[in-house]
């Protein structure tokens, strides 16, 4: 039996890394919002407050999901919400994340160039996940913490768990190979509609991908996107898109 006294000489912080994806046919991105307990609480409370402000209007409810693509494009549950209101929601959400104490890690890959260069390329999600986890591991190490990874549900999640286990035993592929010593357990998958933290990761990753792959033709739209992203820029711990 392990006693409390036996644990006290080895204190360790724990952070959570919430991961989501965004992609086009040519580029694939993953983003992680890395939080301690206090930052997680600030994001949950902040995003809940934003949605509550709009509950009862435009068909929205207190449980409406903050999902990057529908919110940005005015689709699905955001179909009846005016553009100005959607911009307000997105910017307020990014302000909450930026002020929470969270750190953001962003990785991507040029999928078109990968297909052109390799005869039998690895799935983009697997490649970028390895790159992202390396940087989340670095982020946790600098914080003097271990990290638990939580990702949005995907149909290939069992394969990602297997890859994660292989990374931790044999090392990640590539020149920065590491066994991810700061990451613990497995990758945990959860439905984003029940997690404001996963929604935060989705909002961040979608807008990062949008800005990287789709320059706005309208100067006003570009200015709005820049203003929204300005809340995230100061808390980006790492950002890179691999060009094979």
Descriptions of predicted regions:
Residues 1-244:
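Phosphate-ester processing/binding pockets and catalytic centers
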């Amino acid at each position: 039996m392990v006693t409390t006294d036996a644990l006290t000489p080895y204190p360790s912080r724990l952070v959570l890394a919430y991961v989501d994806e965004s992609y086009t046919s040519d580029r694939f991105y993953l983003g992680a919002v890395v939080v301690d307990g206090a930052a997680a609480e600030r994001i949950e409370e902040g995003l809940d407050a934003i949605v509550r402000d709009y509950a009862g209007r435009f068909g929205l409810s207190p449980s409406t999901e903050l999902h990057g693509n529908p919110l940005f494009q005015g689709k699905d549950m955001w179909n009846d919400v005016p553009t100005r209101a959607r911009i307000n929601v997105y910017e307020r959400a990014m302000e909450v994340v930026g002020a929470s104490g969270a750190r953001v890690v962003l990785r991507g890959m040029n999928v078109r160039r990968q297909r052109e260069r390799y005869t039998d390329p690895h799935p983009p999600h697997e490649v970028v996940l390895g790159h992202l986890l390396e940087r989340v591991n670095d982020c946790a190490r600098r914080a003097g913490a271990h990290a638990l990874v939580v990702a949005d549900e995907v149909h290939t999640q069992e394969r990602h768990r297997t890859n994660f286990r292989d990374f931790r035993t044999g090392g990640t592929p590539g020149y920065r190979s590491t066994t991810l010593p700061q990451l613990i357990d497995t990758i945990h998958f959860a439905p984003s509609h029940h997690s404001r933290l996963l929604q935060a990761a989705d909002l961040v990753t979608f807008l990062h991908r949008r800005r990287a792959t789709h320059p706005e033709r309208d100067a006003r739209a570009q200015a709005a996107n820049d203003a929204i992203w300005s809340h995230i820029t100061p808390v980006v711990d790492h950002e890179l898109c691999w060009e094979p």
